[in-house]
Amino acid sequence: MATSSKVKKSVRIASGRKRVRQDVRLNAANTSLRSKFRTAIKGVLKAVATGDKAKAGETFKSAQKVIDSIADKGLFHKNKAARYKSRLSAKIKALAA
């Protein structure tokens, strides 16, 4: 997403300043993880679109690890992670039919 051009007020309280420093670091980490998640999903969908069941299965295995790690870190709710895995799995199973 685009960065905000709004000028933010500086915080006076020490704990607030620390919170701002932490937010910058955590925001960067979350953005990176979210990007890794999207890339993993796209890889599986691309493999499904080509119709290659073997490649789709391999990419799904690696995507599962990424999805689970993101759910464990609390970036997404565990139910959302389960929903993504379920839908991707259904698409791969549909290739066999």
Swiss-Prot record:
Keywords: Ribonucleoprotein, Ribosomal protein, RNA-binding, rRNA-binding. GO terms for cellular component: cytosol; small ribosomal subunit. The keyword Ubl conjugation does not apply. Transmembrane segments: none annotated. GO terms for biological process: translation. The keyword Nucleotidyltransferase does not apply. GO terms for molecular function: small ribosomal subunit rRNA binding; structural constituent of ribosome. Pfam families: Ribosomal_S20p (PF01649). Belongs to the bacterial ribosomal protein bS20 family. Binds directly to 16S ribosomal RNA. This is Small ribosomal subunit protein bS20. The gene is rpsT.
